[in-house]
């Protein structure tokens, strides 16, 4: 389904486009991400739930490991109490299988795996596995026989769907690389003190080409010379299982940011706003809570049908199409509850569910409609595949900050600022790019605008006086949906030192 892949090595972001529309965003996570391998230390053990917390050496939540994921650590197969497996301050080799959420640490396993394009090496298993997506029985028998011949004696192999029709020498070469990678990880575990990160897949070019490049890819655009060289290498290495036509590879050289040219910035900005307008005139709200996500559909101004029943059905079907897209672009996972506009006709309900299921079938995260409840709510689940877009951009260490330099404020009562608003010139671009700000309570300001304002999490106020005035804090209260969460006041004398540290995060554009 892919037509174009856009990779920004400078921002560690990639987008998968189909017919010009962004279908998926890939954002490299600077913190925990799936497949990271750590040498951790056991921090706490909870025998009641047969689980433990593992310190991974970062100032965040510890990793969580359940007894079901401790297979290689068990001395005997029938051990069913985690206290017989782990002890406090014990060093263990673990891998992340689920990225952390806003209030939970990463899920860990001791069953380490190393993924390649065609095979997955399992150092602590001796199993031979063939992907369920390989349906041809002859191909399955062939791959199983090949695995028996090439498998290391103490390791296991899993063949991915991309292994179909691949020459044995190529698979052997990849197996050799994975084994060398594993030996390097083992050596690092011996030579380093726990807790420490041993392996991280930081190459966004490799990740995107390995996971998303296929026969339908026509164009690949990248904004880095080094990235283009890597791209050529991976394309030439893995081209054998695709058509003979190599896609067009383009180095992006325009002065304009690649994320703006392909409207990736705009897509991210819109995906962070709860309200989504529908093509036919309705709208919906998407609210993500800790336990589940709620989507509320409303007809709005749409009334172009011959009957109210037809209006409701068309609006709901339009919303179903948009919801399927929003789940992918926002990477929303877990339990999702949708409140469509009420429909009394069971025939209309069936038509809506059939249409919705068809739209969801295009999602590789395998959403499943559970039921239409008695209250008319559609319940579905979607498999978690990495962090949601909101969780990624809420991480201030990955993205930019937003700076406001205030002129000295007169000592006026804070209440007098409540009627003040941003100047029209400032408000025009703020509200056009990200419709999240309600009011800003200060008199005069100069705003140093970042190219990606919606990435901002922290607001730094540069005050021209040495005195930290409480009125400034009151004056700078923002009401945001998903952005600024911390306000910090810096005297102007600290400003220049701060700029030296964060130069790469600040643009020279003065609004």
Swiss-Prot record:
| InterPro entries in the cross-refs | NA-bd_OB-fold (IPR012340), RNA-bd_AU-1/RNase_E/G (IPR019307), RNase_E/G (IPR004659), S1_domain (IPR003029)
Location within or outside the cell: Plastid, Chloroplast stroma
Pfam families on file: RNase_E_G
Q: Which UniProt keywords apply?
A: Chloroplast, Endonuclease, Hydrolase, Magnesium, Metal-binding, mRNA processing, Nuclease, Plastid, RNA-binding
EC numbers listed for it are: 3.1.26.-
> Keyword DNA-binding: yes or no?
no
Task: Relay the cofactor remark from the entry.
Answer: Binds 1 Mg(2+) ion per subunit.
Q: Where is the S1 motif domain?
A: 35-117
Q: Does the keyword Metal-binding apply?
A: yes
Entry's Gene Ontology cellular component terms: chloroplast stroma
A GO BP entry is:
mRNA processing
Q: Which PANTHER family match?
A: RIBONUCLEASE, RIBONUCLEASE G
UniProt similarity note = Belongs to the RNase E/G family.
Name recorded for this polypeptide: Ribonuclease E/G-like protein
* Gene expressing this chain: rne
């Amino acid at each position: 389904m892919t037509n174009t892949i856009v990779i920004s090595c400078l921002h560690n972001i990639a987008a998968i486009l189909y017919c010009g529309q962004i279908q998926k965003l890939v954002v490299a996570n600077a913190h925990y991400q799936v497949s990271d391998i750590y040498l951790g230390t056991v921090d706490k053990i909870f025998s009641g739930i047969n689980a433990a917390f593992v310190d991974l050496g970062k100032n965040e939540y510890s990793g969580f490991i359940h007894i079901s994921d401790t297979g290689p650590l068990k001395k005997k197969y029938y051990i069913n109490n985690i206290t017989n497996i782990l002890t406090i301050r014990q060093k263990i080799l673990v891998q992340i299988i689920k990225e952390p959420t806003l209030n939970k640490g990463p899920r860990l396993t001791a069953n380490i795996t190393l993924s390649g394009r065609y095979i997955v090496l399992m150092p602590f298993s001796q199993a031979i596995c063939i992907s369920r997506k390989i349906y041809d029985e002859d191909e399955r028998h062939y791959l199983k026989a090949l695995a028996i011949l090439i498998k290391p004696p103490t390791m296991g192999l899993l063949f991915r769907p991309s292994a179909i029709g691949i020459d044995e020498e190529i698979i052997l070469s990849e197996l050799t690389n994975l084994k060398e990678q594993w030996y390097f990880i083992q050596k690092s575990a011996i030579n380093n003190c726990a807790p420490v990160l041993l392996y991280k897949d930081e190459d966004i070019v490799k990740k995107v080409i390995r996971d998303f490049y296929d026969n339908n890819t026509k164009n690949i655009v990248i904004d880095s010379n080094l990235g283009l060289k890597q791209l050529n290498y991976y394309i030439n290495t893995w081209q054998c299982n695709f058509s003979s036509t190599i896609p067009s590879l383009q180095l992006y050289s325009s002065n304009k940011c690649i994320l703006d040219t392909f409207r990736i910035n705009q897509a991210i900005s819109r995906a962070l706003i709860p309200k989504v307008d529908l093509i036919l005139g309705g709208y919906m709200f998407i609210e993500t809570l800790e336990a589940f996500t709620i989507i509320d559909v409303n007809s709005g101004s749409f009334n172009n049908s011959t009957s109210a029943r037809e209006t409701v059905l068309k609006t709901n079907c339009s919303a179903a199409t948009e919801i399927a897209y929003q789940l992918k672009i926002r990477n929303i996972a877990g339990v999702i509850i949708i409140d469509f506009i009420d429909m009394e006709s069971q025939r209309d309900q069936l038509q809506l569910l059939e249409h919705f299921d068809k739209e969801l079938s295009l999602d590789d995260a395998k959403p499943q409609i559970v039921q239409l409840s008695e209250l008319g709510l559609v319940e579905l689940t979607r498999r978690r595949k990495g962090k949601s877009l909101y969780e990624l951009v809420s991480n201030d260490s990955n993205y930019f900050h937003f700076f406001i330099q205030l002129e000295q404020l007169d000592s006026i009562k804070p209440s007098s600022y409540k009627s003040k608003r941003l100047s029209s010139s400032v408000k025009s671009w703020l509200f056009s790019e990200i419709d999240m700000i309600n009011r800003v309570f200060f008199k005069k300001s100069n705003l140093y605008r970042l190219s990606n304002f919606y990435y901002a999490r922290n607001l730094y106020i540069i005050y021209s006086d040495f005195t930290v005035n409480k009125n400034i804090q009151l004056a700078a209260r923002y009401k945001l949906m998903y952005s600024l969460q911390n306000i910090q006041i810096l005297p102007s004398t600290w400003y220049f030192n701060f700029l030296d540290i964060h130069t790469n995060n600040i643009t020279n554009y003065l609004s």
